């Protein structure tokens, strides 16, 4: 389980978060610029908190008091950023295996499950938007992450594609049983995918009590 208690001061917003990430899909909503992306980038190791700590099970990833910092490449995190999500001139296979932290068997399994087997040697830039989203998810899952972080995974898609891709992503995430933070500003999307709903407003992450 990921546990965290940290503050990160950014020019645009100061993010404060204190809690733990349980299994299932946790949706994080909030307005643009509220600090959602900064929060998951701290978990991923792409942004350093100003104060506080982050732990994964018995391993400490961040402890600012002890000046401890585990870099992103040493954390078992699957991160799917917003925006350009594939390397368009690389094949689908090379996109998925880009981190080199998985195995050929894992790649084969992902290609099969994601419906991308026939595109193994196709340049990712030639695929549709929905297919590219599946490539990006495959890359995030390739290293068998302990946590999956998705930053606005449907925002680049037109409305006609969103429902099908959303259902595909949710199905695969649940099948792989990996804890997930799904960031979105779309409330209807949040209601469709999440086991629980966190909010971010002016940098404050609000985590409702469960049970």
What does each of the following model-derived ranges do?
Residues 61-79:
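ABC ATPase NBD coupling module
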Residues 177-183:
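Conserved H-loop
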Residues 123-127, 131-133:
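Conserved ABC ATPase signature
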């Amino acid at each position: 389980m990921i546990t965290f208690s940290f503050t990160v001061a950014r020019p645009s917003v100061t993010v404060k978060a204190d809690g733990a990430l349980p299994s299932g899909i946790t949706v994080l909503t909030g307005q643009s610029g509220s600090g959602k992306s900064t929060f998951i980038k701290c978990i991923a190791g792409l942004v350093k908190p100003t104060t506080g700590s982050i732990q994964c099970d018995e391993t400490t990833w961040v402890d600012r008091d002890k000046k401890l910092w585990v870099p992103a490449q040493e954390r078992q995190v699957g991160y799917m950023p917003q925006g350009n999500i594939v390397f368009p001139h690389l094949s689908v296979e090379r996109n998925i295996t880009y981190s080199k932290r998985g195995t050929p068997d894992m790649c084969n399994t992902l290609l099969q499950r994601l419906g991308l087997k026939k595109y193994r040697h196709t340049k990712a830039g030639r695929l549709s938007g929905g297919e590219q989203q599946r490539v990006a998810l495959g890359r995030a899952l390739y290293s068998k992450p302990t946590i999956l972080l998705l930053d606005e995974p449907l925002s680049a898609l037109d409305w006609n594609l969103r429902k099908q891709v959303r259902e595909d992503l949710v199905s695969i995430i649940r099948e792989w049983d990996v804890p997930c933070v799904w960031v979105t500003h779309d409330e209807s999307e949040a209601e469709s995918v999440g086991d629980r709903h966190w909010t971010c407003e002016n940098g404050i992450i609000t985590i409702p009590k469960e049970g």
